Amino acid sequence: MSDKLKLLFLSASPVDEEALRSDVEIRELHQRIASSLDRKRFEVTAYFAVRTSDLQRILLDHPPNILHFSGHGGEEDGIYLEDDLGRVAPVSGEALAGLFAVFKGTLRIVFLNGCETRAMAEAFRYLVEYTIVMNRRVEDGAAIVFATAFYQALARRQTVRNAFALAVNQLRIDRLDADAPELLEGITPVEVKPAVTKARKKEPTNPGTRSLSQPVTNSRVRKMIIIQGDNNSVKG
């Protein structure tokens, strides 16, 4: 990865889903990065109460190397952003793939810290080097512990694989669900053509929850730029 890492933290908390502690997640994340000797390598930008109408603009304004989503997800729906009234507005893996394609080469890691985000990642995993997802429902506290441990290691020059392994191990240390997170490595799509023989053509074998109490307005999409250098709800 390049010397400078731009981390974009996005959170959504629809009113019709259970409230989660995204504020705690970004606070812990920032503290672990800020306490590292390598803290100046990270530039962290955070947005809360993100609506579907905000998503593309935010990425255009802040093209990230790492995109971190903190919120709800569903195996069939994708991740849950908000509509203008603060209600659930699902965004599918295919829609994210269309967005991530624009940032291919810049966007290196996608971290979807919400329930059941594994299935949707198949739509875009070939566009990024690493995708971190949850393969089932996960407790909010466990999700925060996992994310905190991952960035703590990454900020201390560990590889993505090592940072992921240490984050999973932290869940084991704390006796939390260590089987929910998955690390997916990027896939480069290749056109597979059937092998041709004299006799015949041989066909190839193809071998998450957070909520708000008030309607969302433009002013409620809050942004926080973190200056460099310085629980039992279910996430589903």
What is each stretch, according to the model?
Residues T52, I66, A101, M120-A121:
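Cytosolic/nucleoplasmic/matrix-facing N-terminal domains/tails
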Residues F69-G71, A155, I227:
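Short glycine/serine/threonine-biased micro-segments
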Residues H30, A97, A147-Y151:
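Predominant activation on well-ordered alpha-helical scaffold segments within soluble catalytic domains
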Residues M1-G93, L112:
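A domain-level signal for caspase-like cysteine endopeptidase catalytic cores
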Residues D38, F42-T45, G105-E203:
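Active-site-proximal C-terminal subdomain of hydrolase catalytic domains
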Residues S2, R57, A89-F103, R157-D230, ...:
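Caspase-like cysteine protease fold
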Residues L60-D61, A101-V102, R125-Y126:
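Solvent-exposed polar/charged
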